[in-house]
């Protein structure tokens, strides 16, 4: 069984009523709302025997804008659906495909036996941040990092990054590399599972589903939105 989770950032016209958006000290308005998407499915299959397109098996979607205790209630709704529709004693494994956001990790702690797998999009995003300054050697450097994540230790991974950091032409890229390194290290086992491609680990479709389910109406081709 698979649970996938991601989010979209929606720009609001107002929060509760027109004119209530405020600016902070950096002159940015508080008009961003995080919309959460979680969906449960049983795997991936071809749309037809000869098709190159694939589809999720029995997907069920949940959307919300919850925070704090409401986030707990949001995840409870997800797990209530799972408990009501599946005999968990017969489910061999539940995989969580996600980017490791705090609201997602808090949800994972609410059910036993979840195996967290980092999605490909975010692995590649942060590998690019670590290697973008390598230019023509970028892909070779990324391959070396993938190999370290897949089958070596955190120490091996950090030694490669130290070497890559030494190739920076100036100090402007240091924070980029530091942040990307910290992200992968904080999701280390989840990244390993993704890159090892073991049985049961399926490709994540979160970015595509966020685009189709949320972004098409809320951010990339938006309508007008408020909280109320």
Language model features: what each stretch is:
Residues 1-228:
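Catalytic center-proximal scaffold of phosphoryl-transfer enzymes
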């Amino acid at each position: 069984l698979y649970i996938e989770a991601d989010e979209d950032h929606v720009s609001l016209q107002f929060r509760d009523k027109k004119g209530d958006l405020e600016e902070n000290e950096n002159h940015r308005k508080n008009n961003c709302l995080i919309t959460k998407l979680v969906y449960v499915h049983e795997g991936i299959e071809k749309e037809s025997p000869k098709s190159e397109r694939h589809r999720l098996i029995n997907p069920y979607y949940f959307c919300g804008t919850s925070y704090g205790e409401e986030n707990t209630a949001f995840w409870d709704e997800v797990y209530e659906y799972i408990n009501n529709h599946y005999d968990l004693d017969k489910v061999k494994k539940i995989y969580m495909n996600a980017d490791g956001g705090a609201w997602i990790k808090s949800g994972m702690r609410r059910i036993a036996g979840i195996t967290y797998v980092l999605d490909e999009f975010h692995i590649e995003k942060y590998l690019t941040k670590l290697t973008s300054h390598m230019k023509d050697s970028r892909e070779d450097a990324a391959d070396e990092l993938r190999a370290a994540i897949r089958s070596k230790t955190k120490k091996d991974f950090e030694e490669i990054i130290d070497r890559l950091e030494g190739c920076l032409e100036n100090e402007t890229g240091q924070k980029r590399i530091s942040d990307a390194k910290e992200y992968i290290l904080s999701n280390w086992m989840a990244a390993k599972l993704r890159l090892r491609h073991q049985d049961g680990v399926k490709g994540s479709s979160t970015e595509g589903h966020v685009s189709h389910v949320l972004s098409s109406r809320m951010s990339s081709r938006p309508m007008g939105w408020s909280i109320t």
